[in-house]
Amino acid sequence: MELAICKTDLSATKFMLPPALPSSAAIGSSSAVASTASHFLDKAAHELFQLNAINGHLFKSPASSHLNSVGSPSILSQLNGIGNSGNHSGQVSTMRLKKNRKVTFLSSLVESKNIFIKEEPIHGCKDLCSLSDISDHEASLEVPTALPPLTPGTNRKVNEVLKASFASWEKEVQKCNITKDPREWTEEHVIYWLNWAKNEFSLVSMNLDPFYKMKGRAMVDLGKEKFLAITPPFTGDILWEHLDILQKDCEKPNEDIVHGNSFESATTASVCGSDHQVANYPNETHANSNNSSINSRLSMDYVTSAGNSDNKNFHRATPHSHNGYNTSNTHDRINNSTPPQQQQSQQPTVNGSGSASSNNNNSMLPPAVQQSNNENNNTSSSNTNNSSNNNNNSGGSNNSNAGSNNNNNNNNNINFMAAAAIFQHHLKEEPGTQNGNIGGYGGGSNSQNDPTDLSSYGLPAHLAAYGGGSGSGPTGGRSSGGGGDESDYHSTISAQDHQSQQSSGGNGSGGASGGSTGNSNGYLDSSSEFYGSYAGRNRFHDGYPPEFTPYDAQSFQSMGPQPTAMDQWGAAHAHQHPAAYMSTLGLDKGLLGGYTTQGGVPCFTGSGPIQLWQFLLELLLDKTCQSFISWTGDGWEFKLTDPDEVARRWGIRKNKPKMNYEKLSRGLRYYYDKNIIHKTAGKRYVYRFVCDLQNLVGHTPEELVAKYDLKIEKKDVD
């Protein structure tokens, strides 16, 4: 066996060798040193042989080793020779020569082994049982499946869960006829609501004593902090959250009510509550037999008790009537905070002396009938004596009666906005409705007594046209009015809508009986929806004299100077079928309803209810507007090259600063079903007049282009 001696830095203690002794000590104890060295070398050799036996091979030095290898005598024999030699000093020197050498194991001869430490597997731990495993399965079945568990991991918000839990209150509201607005609750309603919440949410510790003799208004006015102070912990949060949700539901804008037709009104009319109703009349003691007919025609879902309403929210009508252009106060200005819409609703009432019924129907008659009677008698009279202004109008005799201001038709506060939406829905589904006797109310049909004439309540006229703006014609059908869906585009309280529509009832009938509109044009006579909205809209401002506008403030903007009243839309033609006078007037003056002209171009200056199609036609005939709207040269087809500019001008015209193309396009889409304007397929912002516009204006598109020196630029439209 051979051992390889490598690297010369072998320490003296590597093989537990004793440290080198001084020469004097070594000479004195040579035998002891020899015996000790021999003992340690024998022990080291024995351990090396055991290590070789384990590894199965000897440690051999490589051939390239530069170290001095030991020859035939092994290291054991050399070390043993030290003990047997007599020269002790030579033995010590030999040990000193070799003490710095170090024995190492060559890496190429040592087998490497991977030593594994015992570890737990990554997924070896057993999961703890979840709460769902511990919980009672039978108890979990009692949780409503519609409500998600109130855990942090749920995807539903807590507010949505609360709304779902409050859904049962809607049934209680309908069952007990409770108003949705908590501010209108009586003391009984408050206690009923608290008892419902106590049973619904198992509020055992709920104390109702602080809420006795407390109305809904007072409860809401407490505020959240005071409300929580008189309710148990956590219970008050639930109750206040419900109150907050109910109030927010009642404060939604009107556009959510009228099926998405969001007209921008100056009022903040709401679904529920007399605080926000468009028209609320005081509750008089006069008997009225028309309440049953109103309730039978209108949805009972919108009927609330008048006794629960706060009388301070009512606005009484003016106790005098308008005879011609009355220069006195025409609407109640006592309450300066009254919104313009409510001021407009304060119109005088009319008692139909020729009606079949004997009861007082003052507020059932629209203000337009009274105004029509007065204007037909004497439009310049300022006499306020109502008994001296009896006149005949198309077979019906009506007498203005301001002394009996019997606004007793509103014993139940009816949400007329929602009611009009119901009429709108039903009338849309009636095919072939005809516009019979728009303004005359004659021909044996006592239209004045129609309890569904919503215009008498101050309802915006484009909605009232569905119910009250229609008369009973020869066919017995009801006119749809054709104006409800255009609510975004015809402002209900436009600052430029004036008293120029004075003769709202007389000219439309054109005859004594039969309800004919007096229109000689065959095509337009058969399409009453085309112009039916004029009757409803003109009646809305009939009660205003020329010096007053629906807004007391200055109007937003105007496209031109305000002309005189006789130069306005419908100065002598209000409620007349447009074709009846458009065909009799010249193009410059009568193309768009008696507009004034600027440089030979018809220009509607802002008075009277202009419709969107008329406005577009006006722009198309204005040479200065060709940069944003122009004819394409294909018949009556036109393109909005800059739709935002068109929408901006339309907003200026209708006093709607927030008008944009999205809202304007809704008005254009409304014309699709009425066959007035169609969208050209495959072309962006390109539309076409599909009505008989040529027969209406008496000119072809080419003639209009030549007359007004318009340029037709055929462009590639995408």
UniProtKB/Swiss-Prot annotation:
GO terms for molecular function: DNA-binding transcription activator activity, RNA polymerase II-specific; DNA-binding transcription factor activity, RNA polymerase II-specific; sequence-specific DNA binding; transcription cis-regulatory region binding. The modification Phosphothreonine is found at residue 151. Disruption phenotype: Embryonic lethal showing loss of photoreceptors. In larvae, RNAi-mediated knockdown results in a transformation of type II neuroblasts into type I neuroblasts, elimination of intermediary neuronal progenitors (INP) and generation of extra type II neuroblasts; in the ventral nerve cord, results in increased numbers of type I neuroblasts. Simultaneous RNAi-mediated knockdown of the zinc-finger transcriptional repressor erm, the transcriptional repressor E(spl)mdelta-HLH or the transcriptional repressor dpn restore normal neuroblast numbers. This is ETS-like protein pointed. Belongs to the ETS family. Residues 610-690 bind DNA. GO terms for biological process: cell dedifferentiation; cell differentiation; compound eye photoreceptor cell differentiation; determination of adult lifespan; determination of genital disc primordium; epidermal growth factor receptor signaling pathway; epithelial cell migration, open tracheal system; epithelial cell proliferation involved in Malpighian tubule morphogenesis. The lineage of its organism: Eukaryota, Metazoa, Ecdysozoa, Arthropoda, Hexapoda. InterPro entries: Ets_dom, ETS_fam, Pointed_dom, SAM/pointed_sf, WH-like_DNA-bd_sf, WH_DNA-bd_sf. Residues 164-250 form the PNT domain. Residues 337-363, 372-412 have a biased composition (Low complexity). Keywords: Activator, Developmental protein, DNA-binding, Nucleus, Phosphoprotein, Transcription, Transcription regulation. GO terms for cellular component: nucleus. Residues 303-412, 430-521, 545-571 are annotated as: Disordered. Residues 466-484, 505-517 have a biased composition (Gly residues). The gene is pnt. ETS transcription factor with a prominent role during development of the eye and the nervous system. Required for glial-neuronal cell interactions at the ventral midline which are necessary for the proper elaboration of commissures in the embryonic CNS. It comes from the Eukaryota. It is found in: Nucleus. Residues 320-329, 552-561 have a biased composition (Polar residues). The keyword ATP-binding does not apply. The keyword Transcription regulation applies.
